[in-house]
């Protein structure tokens, strides 16, 4: 009868709606679970290092190692992201370094994933951070600078996502000019997190930084 036909069509429509809803829900669940999530990362922490860069750039090049072995393991897919670096250029006690009377002084530093024997350009693939301080003694007697300028022109905080490091050692190095009366010390404090990557990606990054 016509009524039976209408009822049958209605039941088929109901079954179709339920089946379609289940298929869409299953597809949405699969889509959500198949999307790659963000890389796991730690809370931020700080790594500190200092280097005596002397006061005779004609003959001195000084470098100190920064051990990252506790944080970086390319084979284990663990890498270090540096978010910020704070830099201090002082004497050995943390005070302003003295200059010779009426002399200028320049102090440069760099942090690199490769050991260096001198300053390198920002285009060097191993360079993580660099900067300089220029100072002038204006009183006519040995003492602290009357004029100072600084240029920290290459730091991780200048970049959108900081700087990712996959090597187990970085190198803090630098030099200072003879206008300084005493040896200059550069100290850095780096805000970092540890993140996970795929083994292949971590190894490729490590090789590119060596």
Question: What do these predicted regions represent?
Answer:
Residues 80-87, 162-180:
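Noncatalytic modules at the cell exterior or secretory-pathway interfaces
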Residues 10-13, 30:
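Residues marking helix boundaries in flexible regions
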């Amino acid at each position: 009868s016509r009524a039976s036909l209408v009822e049958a069509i209605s039941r088929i429509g109901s079954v179709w709606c339920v089946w379609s809803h289940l298929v869409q829900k299953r597809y949405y669940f699969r889509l959500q679970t198949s999307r790659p999530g963000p890389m796991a990362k730690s809370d931020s922490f700080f790594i500190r290092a200092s280097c005596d860069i002397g006061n005779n750039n004609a003959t001195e090049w000084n470098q100190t190692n920064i051990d990252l072995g506790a944080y970086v393991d390319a084979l284990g897919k663990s890498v270090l992201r540096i978010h910020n670096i704070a830099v201090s250029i002082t004497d050995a006690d943390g005070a302003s370094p003295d200059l010779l009377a009426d002399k200028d002084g320049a102090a440069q530093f760099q942090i690199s994933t490769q050991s260096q024997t001198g300053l390198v350009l920002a285009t060097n693939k191993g360079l993580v951070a660099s900067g300089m301080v220029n100072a002038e003694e204006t009183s006519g007697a040995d003492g602290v600078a009357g004029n100072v300028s600084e240029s920290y022109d290459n730091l991780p905080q200048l970049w959108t996502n900081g700087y990712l490091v996959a090597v187990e050692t970085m190198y803090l190095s630098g030099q200072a000019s003879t206008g300084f009366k005493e040896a200059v010390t550069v100290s850095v404090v780096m805000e970092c997190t540890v993140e996970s990557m795929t083994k292949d990606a971590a190894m490729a990054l490590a090789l590119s930084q060596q």
